[in-house]
C-alpha cells in the first residue's frame, strides 16, 4: 500500500498528548532533548491552558509528530507523499529530510519565537464557515483582518488583532454566518502580521544542512508537489506571512490517489475534511485509535486486504 501522510497544525492538542509524548520520549530515548527545549512538558501541574501559547505549542506539537512518525515508519509500506498544515509543514519537511529531534526542536522553537515577536499586539485566528470568499473579503478589508487559510470554497481561517477579530465576528453574526469560532492559537499566522518573522527565519533555515527529501512533499501552502529540498524550504518560508490554500493541497493529494491517507495529528480535523470531500477514500488519524497496538493492528489488517 502507498501512503500519504498529513501533519496537523495547532489548536487540537490536549493533555492526553502530553502523557503520550512523555511515554514516547522514554521509549525513543529522547527525554534529554525534550527537557532541554520543552522543560515545561515535565511539570506536574501542567494544565490544558498551558498547551496553547505559541512558544510552547509549536515545539510541543512538532515533538509529538516527530515521535509518532518514528514509531509509524516501520509500519508504513510505500510512502507516496508528506503534507503539512501550517506548523505541520515544518514537521513534514523535518521528517522528509530525516532530521533528528534536537535540530527539529530548535527549528520549531525559532519559528515560534520569531512569530511571537512579530505579533506585537494580542492577536489570533478565527474559523469561519458558510460564507464565500467574495462576500468575506470586503469584511476583512473593513475590519483590518486577513485571510490566513482557505479550507474550502465556504470555509476559511482568518487572522488579525483581537479587537479587529471581534469586530469581524460581530459583522459575520449580523449576516447570519453559519459558524464562527475563535481558535486556540495566539498569533495571526500566515498573514501580514508575521512579516517581521520572515527574514530572520529564512536565515535560520539557510544555516541548516538539509538532506534530500526521502519522499515527495505536497505543499500545504498551495498543493505544489516538491521533489527538491530547496523548493520545500522556500515554501515553508513563504507561508509564514502568506495565506495557505489547504483546499488546493487536499485536491492534489486526492489526484495522486494514495491507497491510504494517515493524519499524524494532533486531532483528526484534516482527515475528516478529506473524508467529506471523498467518502470512498481510506483516511484515518492516529488520534482515531485508543492505543498504538490498535493502530498497528488496523494497519496490518489493511495491508492484507
What would you call each of these model-derived segments?
Residues 10-11, 97-234, 238:
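Alpha/beta catalytic cores of group-transfer enzymes, especially the acyltransferase/condensing modules
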Residues 30-41, 63-131, 136:
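Patatin-like phospholipase
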Residues 17-20, 95-96, 170, 273-276:
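Short amphipathic alpha-helical segments
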Residues 64-77, 82, 240-305:
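Flexible, low-complexity segments
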Residues 10-13, 86, 90, 162, ...:
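Gly/Ser/Thr-rich beta-alpha loop segments that engage phosphate groups in nucleotides
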Residues 1-83, 158:
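Helix-rich "cap/lid" substructures immediately adjacent to catalytic or cofactor-binding pockets
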Residues 7-9, 34, 65, 88, ...:
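Conserved small-residue
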